Amino acid sequence: MQPSIPGTRGSKNSVAQRALTTGSSSSGEGLMRSTLEPSAPSCCESASLREVTSAAGPIAPARSEPPSRLCENGPVEASNFALTDVQRQFRDTLRQYAEERIAPQAAEVDRTAEFPWKSFKACVELELPALGIPEAYGGAGADMVTQAIMAEELARVCASTSLTMLISKLGMLPVMNWGSDELRRHYLPKVAAGEMQASYCLSEADAGSDVAAMKSRAVRDGDDYILTGSKYWITNAGISDVYVVFAKTDPVAGGRGITCFLVERDWGITVAKHEDKMGLRGSPTGEVTLNEVRVPASHRIGAEGQGFTIAMHTLDRSRPTIGAQAVGIAQGAIDYSASYMKQRHAFGGPIADLQGLRFMLADMAMRTEAARALVYRACAMVDDDPSDELTLFGAMAKAFASDTAMSVTVDAVQLLGGYGYTRDFPVERFLRDAKVTQIYEGTNQVQKVVIAREILKHA
C-alpha cells in the first residue's frame, strides 16, 4: 500500500520505490546516498499515512505525545520521543523520498547554482508546499513541528531545496495573518499547489538588521500605491511570482511609517543582479528593484504603518523553521561522517575505533540533539497562540541551531581530513550551506540582543 503525506487531503502520490544500492562507493556523493538509507523496513511497505492518521489521531504539536523508546532509527538521533506516531511516519517517509528524489541532484545544484526545478517538482508531487497553508485555503494545515520536520529532512540532503519550501511560506505568512480574505483566497491556494512561489522583501542595502532605516517608498495615488526602491538579499529573486514588499508610506515616522504590500512580479518588479554565493547556491538571491510600480490598494497587507509589526510578527514565526533547516544540515553532516568513519581505515582498522574521533562525533550529536529539542519547543509555541515567549524562544532556537550547524559541519570536514576539503564529498557543501543560517532572518548577534532584552523584560 502506498503512503501519502499526512495532512495533504488524502493524496495518492506514491514515494519512489527503494532503488539505491547499499555497497561502498568511491564517490563521496554516492557514499552519502548509499550509506544514509534507513536501516528500518522501507516506509513504502507500510500502511498509508492516512490510515495511520485515523488510528493515531491528527497531527499535533510534539509536546502532546507521551515519551516512547529512544533511538528508533539508530543511535545518532534521539528525539523521536517527542513526536507523535504520525509525525514519525511523515519523517520516515520524507527521509526516504528525499534520499531517492532530492539527494541525487544536490551536488549538481550546488555546482551549477541553478534553481533546483527537478527537486522542487518532486516536493510538489508530495504536496509539500501545502504543508504550512491553512486547510481553508487549499493547504494541509499541518502543525509547526511537522513543518520543522519537513525543513530538517530536506536540508539533511539539500539545503537549497529545503529553502525553496520555506521561502514561499515566509512570503505568505503576512497574507495568512494580516491580509484580506480576498488576498488569501486568490493567492494561498496557488502557493499551496506549487503553482506560485513567493518572496519576502524586507532588507535593503543599508537596512538589514536596522529595518526602520529602509528607504523604499510607497505613495498613495487614488486607488493605488506607487512603489519605488530596491530590496537586497531577496531569496527566490526572479523565480517567485509574488513578492511581499515593505516600504515607507510615511518617510519621517521611522519604523511606524512602514507599510506592507503584496506585489505580483509582472507589475514591474525587476531583478538587478543575482549574488554569487558561498552556499545555498541552488537558491537564487538577488536585488529586487521597483521603479514606480503601481500596486492596487487592495494589495496592501494590514493598515498603513503596520508594516514593522507585521515584519517582526512574521519573523518570530519563521525563525524556528530556520533552526530546523540548520538542524537538518547538521544531521546530514553527522550521518555522513559516521558512515565514513566506519568505512575509512587507518592504523590497522576503521577510524571509528579511534577514541578521539568518537568523542568528536559524540559532541556533534549532543549539540544537534539539543538544538532539535529547542527548535521543536519553539515550533510548538507557534501553535499555542503565543505570548512574548515566542520572540525569546524563536530567537534562541534560530541562534543556537545555526551555531550548532556551523560547528558540526566544521567538525565533519575535520573528520574526513583532506577528503572533507574537496567537493567530491558533501560535507564541505554542508559547511558552506550552514553559514547563512547564522545570518539570514536576523543575524545571531541580533538574536542575542533580542534574547537578552526578553530575559531582562521579565526579570
Regions found by a protein language model. Give the residues of each.
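Alpha-helical interface subdomain recognition
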Residues: 23-28, 40-43, 65, 69-161, ...
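Flexible, small-/acidic-enriched active-site or ligand-binding loops
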Residues: 213, 268-296
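A short, Trp-centered hydrophobic/proline-enriched beta-strand micro-motif
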Residues: 194-202
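A short core secondary-structure module
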Residues: 223-224, 228-271
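Short Gly/Pro-enriched turn/cap motifs at secondary-structure boundaries
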Residues: 191, 206-209, 233-236, 250-252, ...
